[in-house]
């Protein structure tokens, strides 16, 4: 009887020890550090973070919440080593709170320190942009415009070159035909001159 009870007690202790070890491993996973909001737009943002070296992290979980609103958005991704995540479908001029957690095989880490940020209005973004500031998108558009202009210029030059070449060819043909035309004119003029008498004298009209 005591043998059965003793075996059951040993199994119970082993099970409790396993649960305790799992909870310790999960608790030993540190919360993400240096949580930062970057590339803040009116309807999107990018959250970045760091982890302690040596933490067996296999993914992350992000909790996004509007300030003073209970509704949450939960983003989770595993089998990744990325340290950033895009937040989308945000509302302009709205405050949000973000927490980040690391995920390991044993569970999740405690949440990071909350990060509060506010999305700007589109008008504020345009006003804050200096006249000399040039974005990569604008640079790309300018490059496309320049490429289009160059293509048009090249096409026009090729067309003009073709027209000039055709004109030169026609001019050469006309110039080559001029001696033949002169010969024909001289021949025609000689045939139309005053005919000579068969005996060698010129025909004269009788008075």
From Swiss-Prot:
The record marks 73 as: Required for dimerization. It is a single-pass type I membrane protein. Residues 178-188 have a biased composition (Basic and acidic residues). Keywords: Cell membrane, Glycoprotein, Hormone, Membrane, Peroxisome, Secreted, Signal, Transmembrane, Transmembrane helix. It is found in: Cell membrane; Peroxisome membrane. It holds the Pfam family DUF4808. Residues 168-207 are cytoplasmic. Residues 1-26 form the signal peptide. Residues 27-146 are extracellular. The extracellular domain is cleaved and released from the cell membrane. The keyword Lipid biosynthesis does not apply. Residues 178-207 are annotated as: Disordered. Residues 31-122 form the Fibronectin type-III domain. A motif (Microbody targeting signal) lies at residues 205-207. One of its GO terms (cellular component) is plasma membrane. Glycans are attached at residues 34, 79. GO terms for molecular function: hormone activity. Fibronectin type-III domain is capable of forming a continuous intersubunit beta-sheet dimer; dimerization may thereby play a role in cell-cell adhesion or signaling. This is Fibronectin type III domain-containing protein 5b. The gene is fndc5b.
């Amino acid at each position: 009887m005591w043998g059965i009870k003793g075996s059951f007690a040993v199994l119970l202790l082993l099970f409790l020890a396993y649960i305790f070890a799992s909870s310790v491993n999960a608790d030993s996973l540190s919360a993400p550090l240096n949580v930062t909001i970057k590339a803040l737009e009116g309807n999107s943002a990018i959250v970045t973070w760091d982890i302690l070296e040596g933490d067996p992290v296999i993914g992350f979980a992000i909790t996004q919440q509007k300030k003073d609103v209970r509704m949450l958005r939960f983003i989770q991704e595993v089998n990744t080593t990325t340290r950033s995540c895009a937040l989308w479908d945000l509302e302009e001029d709205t405050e949000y709170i973000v927490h980040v957690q690391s995920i390991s095989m044993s569970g999740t880490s405690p949440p990071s320190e909350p990060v509060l940020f506010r999305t700007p209005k589109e008008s504020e973004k345009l006003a804050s942009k200096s006249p000399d500031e040039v974005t990569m998108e604008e640079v790309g558009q300018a490059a496309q415009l320049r490429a289009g202009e160059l293509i048009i210029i090249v096409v026009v030059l090729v067309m003009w070159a073709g027209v000039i070449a055709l004109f030169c060819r026609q001019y050469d043909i006309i110039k080559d035909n001029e001696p033949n035309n002169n010969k024909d004119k001289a021949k025609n003029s000689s045939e139309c001159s005053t005919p000579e008498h068969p005996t060698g004298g010129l025909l004269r009209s009788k008075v």
